[in-house]
Amino acid sequence: MDLASRKIVGWSMSERMKADLVCEALKSAYWRRKPAAGLIMHSDRGSQYAGESHRQLIKDYRMIQSMSTRGNCWDNAAMESFFKTLKVERVHQLRYQTRAQAKLDIVNWIEGFYNQRRMHSSIGYQTPVDAERSLMAA
């Protein structure tokens, strides 16, 4: 997530939460955005984020790693809020027949609804795409 616009810029899905999952999500975000060196990559303190493969990828991309304070859920509140929204507004509303169907639907929801049409109070009741445009124009 781009914290300034709340736009979801990279993701990956898997049956298990492993280091390669978060590395794939970071690669997705990196290649879509191609950020300048020094971008802060924030996460919780999960073992996948603290692992060598993820730390090395952050170093290779010349990013700065930031991790939540131990026991402080507020440090990663924006992502926690996104996952709650995804579950409540989409995933728990449907019954998927296959994992492939679920993945396709979730990607379509992120790209077609969440980033494009869902307004957020934290960015002045704009959509993430509109907030990003406003930030780029400033």
Name every feature range the model reports, one short phrase each.
Residues 1-138:
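Charged DNA-binding/catalytic regions of mobile-element recombinases
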